[in-house]
Every structure is written in C-alpha cells, then in structure tokens.
C-alpha cells in the first residue's frame, strides 16, 4: 500500500504551487477579472441607495436617466470579466493537470520493477487519471470561487460598513463562528476524499481484471464472481460519496442558519431609535440586500471547501508516489557495444518483502558468443536469473560481471541497450506491426531492415496476407494476432536490434511444431557470435546449447551439455524422459 503523508492543507498547496507558478500570468489576469466581476455585482447593489433616496424619494429624473446606462455597462463588464476569468483559470488548470500527469507518468517509468510487483495496474491508472483530475479542483473551480466570492464578501462588507457600521458589527461577531464551522467540516471532507480515492483505485482494478480476463470469465463462468466483486467496490464508492454529500448537506444549512441569525439581529438592531435616526430607505435596503447577497458567496465558499479538500487529498496521494525512490542508476560506465562475456559469482537474491531467497549461491559463466540454457520446473528461478542480468532487480550477495565489470557500474540505459529480450509474455502496442518491430527505434531503421527482420522471424508469411501488411494496426497487446504470430513479432524485434546479448525466455513456447522448427533456424543464426541465455520448457530447443544448467529451487544442481547430462541420468534426464515419454 502507498503511504500518504498527512500534510496540512497549506503544506500540500505550498508544494503544489511550483507546478502552478509558471502560469502565474494567467492567474493574475484571471484574478483581476474575478475581482472586476465581483465588483460589478457589489456596485450594482450600491445603486439601490441613490435610486431609492434620490431617484424616487426626491424625484430626481437625472438619476433615472443615467441609471439604465450604468446597469448595462456593469452587465457588459460582468460578462466580459466572467469569460476572461473562466478561460484563464481553465487554461492554467489544464496546464497543471498535464504537467502533473507527465511528471507522474515519467516518475512511474523510472520506478523499479519491484514497485509494479506490489501495485495493481488499476490503482496506478486511477492515480494518473482520476487523482490527477482531482487536482484541477484546487487550481480551477475552487480558485474561481475563492477569489470571486472572497472579493464579493470583502466588497459587500466594505459597503455595509460605509453605510451603517453599527449594523455591520453584528456580522463581525458572527464571522469567527462561521470560520470554525468551515474548519471542522474541512477535516471531515479530507478524510472521506482519501477513502474515495482508494476505493476508485479498487473500482478501476476490478474493471481492468474483468476486461483483460474476459475470455477466462466466460469460459469458467465467472460472471457472478466478477459481478459481485465489482458491485462490492462500487457500493463502497457510493457509500463514500454519500458521506461526502451528507457532510456537505449538513454544512450548507449550518452556515445559512448562522447567517440567518445575523440577519435577524440586524433587523432587531435597526428598530432601535438611535440607529433608525441614521438610516434612510435606501441605506437599510442596501445593507439588508448586502447581507442577503452574502449568503451566496458564503454558501459557495462552504461548497468549494469539499472540492478543494478533494484536490488536496489527491495531491497528497500523488506526492506520496513522487516521493518514492526511483530505480537506482549510479553507474558511470557507458559502452557502445560489449563483447558479451557474462559471469555470476556466488549470487544470492531475494525478492523485495520476501525472506526466503529465490536464488542461492548461483555461479555461472557465459563466454562471448556462447549459448547457455536454463531448464527446470516452473518457479525454480530461471526467469529470475534473466531479470538480474538486465538489472530489473539488484542482488543482495555476490557479483554479476559483464566483460569483467560489475553490472552495477554500467549506466542502466547503456546496459539494457546491449540486451535483446524475447519472453513468453509478449507485450505488443496498439500500433502498426512495423512500429512494434522497430519499437523505440523507428527513426533508426529503414523499412527494408524492418521487413528483413520480419522475414528472418518467419513473420512475413502472415503479414503479407493482411490488407495493410506491415502497416496493419494490431490492437491492444496484439489482440488481432494469434499467440504464435505475436511471438514472431517479438522475435523480429529482437532480430532488428542486433544486440550482443540475447535472452530468450520461453521464446518459442507459443509456436506450433512447424513454426517452431522454422523460427529455430532463425534463432540459431541469430545466436551466432552472440552471448545467449535461453530459458526453455521444450528441451528439444536447447539440445545444441554449449552448456545447460538445471535449476531446482533456486540452486544449480546440474551443468553440462545435452549428452553429458543425459549420460548422468540425473534431474535433466528425468525431465527429458517426462517430456518425450522415453
């Protein structure tokens, strides 16, 4: 679980501010427009006094003539300022959300593999989409309301004190009570908001699991189970939403009740003879209308608090991810192309959070241009060895050497640029076949090179039958391709990269026998003059390996070539007999 730091609202906003400040020009323009918008409303109310006292009370026709023109001018100012403020704040908000998402996305890309082992994809997607969107509440809608309604309250208070400071003092007494009520409600809003964000992550995870595993749901009749799971998390989301509504619904009438008490006191105070002597019809109308007008901004400020607290809670959640340490890259060695001499020297490794080592005292050597195969039952640690070679994880004991240099001395980008990986879990992107083969290197390779790689991987057989050929978009994770076709695209990608080190993790597991024979020829050619680490379930694919290592429960129990291991009648021979029925 992610640990959210319990920061105060001010601390959180102060940390968010550097993301907003580059666009402060837009904020300043928006603030000026909002103040003008609030001022136009306040000035409109102030016109009631001359209209009543002079226009109607003293029958001053001049006031009645210019008053409509002033009203029209104020309405034009109100409309223009409203447009400018909304546009500027939305522009700033969009920039902040975009930058927050970019920063979060880039940070997640730099996180170690262990981070993704411990987090569900749905939760992380919710952080990038839902939580980032909630930040907009802090920088757009809430900002508009705070500035505009704050300016309205200040303007109305100033006008009331100008016309009758005696009546206005009553509101000064009530203000601390309103402030205390808002502060108490704020705490409740933030608590509920955090729970809503966590629940939203669960909703996303539940939906994602059903969508990705739709075939399994259908074949195993899991509709009821998935429906119950989704209904459960959806209901929790609804319950948290209702708690937020309840808190908001209680706060609104509470603030309005306090304000109504102030109105009642004002009316009562206005009946005192000493006060009545200072009041005219216009004055009491302006003061009383201003007090009623204060209800709207007070209510808006109370409502915006819930919105603002959601944004602050989202910020805390996102900052907790941004505070996590990214993948360590302390190496300084950069190489264009390594020779490919690999050595594991007494390596012991445990996955984060697990006490039992997955690998025990592993020592192996793969000379340049040689092929070493790892065999063993599922979960024996074969793929873990491959993961360590690419530094997806760092070892706790021992040393891994590449060309005689500790793996940790290389810069990660330089190290991984030396390795081509084809795993049993092929991931393809929702793009064309050509772009998938040349992934991340589109500008480096020509169309002819991409086609040659596909042909060497025996992928052109099915690609040429497609209407768009290499330009065919294959859908999310290659959904439009068969398992064997997806595997051949991945092999073509490795062929194109032409790296000195090759890792084949069950690379032919999804191929039929005929395709496997064809692709094995390409892999044999690819492995020449390259250091290859092959993890295989089908033992027939690794019989020609220079050395075969048998891994059992994280330990190498046998090593040798195919003939040597078969002659020993050990674990390898047993696996071979089980597979071929000998």
From Swiss-Prot:
**Biological role stated in the UniProt entry:** Involved in lipopolysaccharide (LPS) biosynthesis. Translocates lipid A-core from the inner to the outer leaflet of the inner membrane. Transmembrane domains (TMD) form a pore in the inner membrane and the ATP-binding domain (NBD) is responsible for energy generation.
Q: What is this protein called?
A: ATP-dependent lipid A-core flippase
Q: Which organism is it from?
A: Sodalis glossinidius (strain morsitans)
Q: How does it sit in the membrane?
A: Multi-pass membrane protein
The lineage, from the top, is: Bacteria, Pseudomonadati, Pseudomonadota, Gammaproteobacteria, Enterobacterales
Using the record, list the residue span of the signal peptide; answer none if the entry has no such feature. Answer: none
Q: Which PROSITE patterns match?
A: ABC_TM1F, ABC_TRANSPORTER_1, ABC_TRANSPORTER_2, MSBA
CDD domains the record matches: ABC_6TM_MsbA_like, ABCC_MsbA
Where in or outside the cell it occurs: the entry states: Cell inner membrane
* Binding annotation for ATP: 376-383
A Pfam family of this chain: ABC_membrane
- The EC number on file is 7.5.2.6
């Amino acid at each position: 679980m992610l640990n959210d730091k319990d920061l105060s609202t001010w601390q959180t906003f102060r940390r968010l501010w550097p993301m907003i400040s580059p666009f402060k020009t837009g904020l300043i323009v928006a603030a000026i427009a909002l103040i003008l918008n609030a001022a136009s409303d306040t000035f409109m109310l102030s016109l009631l006094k001359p209209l009543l006292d002079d226009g109607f009370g003293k029958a001053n026709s001049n006031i009645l003539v210019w008053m409509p023109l002033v009203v029209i001018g104020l309405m034009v100012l109100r409309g223009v300022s409203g447009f400018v403020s909304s546009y500027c704040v939305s522009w700033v908000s969009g920039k902040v959300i975009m930058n927050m998402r970019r920063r979060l996305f880039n940070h997640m890309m730099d996180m170690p593999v262990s981070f993704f082992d411990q987090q569900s994809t749905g939760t992380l997607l919710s952080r990038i989409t839902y939580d980032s969107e909630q930040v907009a509440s802090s920088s757009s809608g809430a900002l508009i309301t705070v500035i505009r309604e704050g300016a309205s309250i200040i303007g109305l208070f100033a006008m009331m004190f100008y016309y009758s400071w005696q009546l206005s003092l009553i509101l000064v007494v009530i203000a601390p009570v309103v402030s205390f009520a808002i502060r108490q409600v704020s705490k409740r809003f933030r608590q509920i908001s955090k729970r809503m964000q966590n629940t939203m992550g669960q909703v996303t995870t539940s939906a994602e699991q059903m969508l990705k595993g739709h075939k399994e749901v259908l074949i195993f009749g899991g509709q009821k189970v998935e429906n119950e799971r989704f209904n459960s998390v959806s209901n929790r989301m609804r319950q948290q939403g209702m708690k937020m509504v309840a808190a908001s619904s209680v706060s609104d009438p509470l603030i309005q009740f306090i304000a109504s008490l102030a109105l009642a006191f004002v009316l009562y105070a206005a009946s005192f003879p000493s006060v009545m002597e200072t009041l005219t019809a216009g004055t009491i109308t302006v003061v009383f209308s201003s007090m009623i007008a204060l209800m709207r901004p007070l209510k808006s400020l109370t409502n915006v608090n819930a919105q603002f607290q959601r944004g602050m809670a989202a910020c805390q959640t996102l900052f907790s991810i941004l505070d996590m340490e990214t993948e360590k890259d302390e190496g300084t060695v950069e190489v264009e192309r390594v020779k490919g001499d690999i050595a594991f020297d007494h390596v012991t490794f445990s996955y984060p959070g697990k006490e039992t080592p997955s690998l025990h005292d592993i020592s192996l050597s793969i000379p340049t241009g040689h092929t070493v195969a790892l065999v063993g039952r599922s979960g024996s640690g074969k793929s873990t060895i491959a993961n360590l070679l690419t530094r997806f994880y760092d070892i706790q004991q021992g040393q891994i050497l590449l060309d005689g240099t500790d793996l940790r001395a290389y810069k990660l980008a330089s190290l991984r640029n030396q390795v081509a990986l084809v795993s049993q879990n092929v991931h393809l992107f929702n793009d064309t076949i050509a772009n998938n083969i040349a992934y991340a290197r589109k500008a480096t390779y020509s169309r002819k090179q991409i086609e040659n790689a596909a042909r060497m991987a025996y992928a052109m057989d099915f690609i040429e039958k497609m209407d768009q050929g290499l330009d065919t978009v294959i859908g999310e994770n290659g959904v439009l391709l068969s398992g064997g076709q997806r595997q051949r695209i991945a092999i073509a990608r490795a062929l194109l990269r032409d790296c000195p080190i090759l890792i084949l993790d069950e690379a032919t597991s999804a191929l039929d026998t005929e395709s496997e024979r064809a692709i094995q020829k390409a892999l044999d050619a690819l492995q020449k003059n390259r250091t290859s680490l092959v993890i295989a379930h089908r033992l027939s694919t690794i019989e020609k390996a220079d050395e075969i290592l048998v891994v059992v429960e994280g330990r190498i129990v046998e090593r040798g070539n195919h003939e040597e291991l078969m002659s020993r009648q050990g674990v390898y021979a047993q696996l071979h007999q089980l597979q071929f029925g000998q």
